[in-house]
From Swiss-Prot:
Residues 173-185, 218-227 have a biased composition (Polar residues). It comes from the Eukaryota. One of its GO terms (cellular component) is vesicle. The keyword Phosphoprotein applies. InterPro entries: BASP1. Residues 106-139 have a biased composition (Low complexity). This is Brain acid soluble protein 1. The gene is BASP1. Residues 1-227 are annotated as: Disordered. The modification Phosphothreonine is found at T31, T36, T196. It is a lipid-anchor. Keywords: Cell membrane, Cell projection, Isopeptide bond, Lipoprotein, Membrane, Myristate, Phosphoprotein, Ubl conjugation.
Amino acid sequence: MGGKLSKKKKGYNVNDEKAKEKDKKAEGAATEEEGTPKESEPQAAAEPAEAKEGKEKPDQDAEGKAEEKEGEKDAAAAKEEAPKAEPEKTEGAAEAKAEPPKAPEQEQAAPGPAAGGEAPKAAEAAAAPAESAAPAAGEEPSKEEGEPKKTEAPAAPAAQETKSDGAPASDSKPGSSEAAPSSKETPAATEAPSSTPKAQGPAASAEEPKPVEAPAANSDQTVTVKE
């Protein structure tokens, strides 16, 4: 700019003022242009800062989302493990529930042999008076055999009563007649505890001995009369 002004001063003195004004305008425009970039630079600097903050925010959001996803995965895994543990508990409970019925079955099976063991005794005791009455009347043994079949549950009290009543019986042939009632009565006696529940067994044994006692006494009376 200085060279141009010097040339103008040398060659064109008339236009010096106009040239100076033009130079001033050009310098002012240049300063304005230089000023605007300076003003825009802070804005540009502010914009990258905002952009950086914006980028950091998505990163933080992404981290937060990742943590949330991990938390959800952990929760889902915990939920999945919980149902797995629950079926195990239910299986254990089912096994525990399945085992108690076995115990009653064993208990029911236990009185079976006991009743079966007592049933032959009752059959032998009942067969003794039946044999003594057999020469006199052949109908009484069949009646007596039919009655113990009806009263299978109270075999034990009947055995106790018939032992005391049938002990003095005197016969030399107890083999065949004893085997028949014992073979007929024992399966029925063994079936009774397995088919009847615990509650019904004692109730039946408590209620039914009365009708059993009567035929036992009647049979003893008939035996004594016929003897």
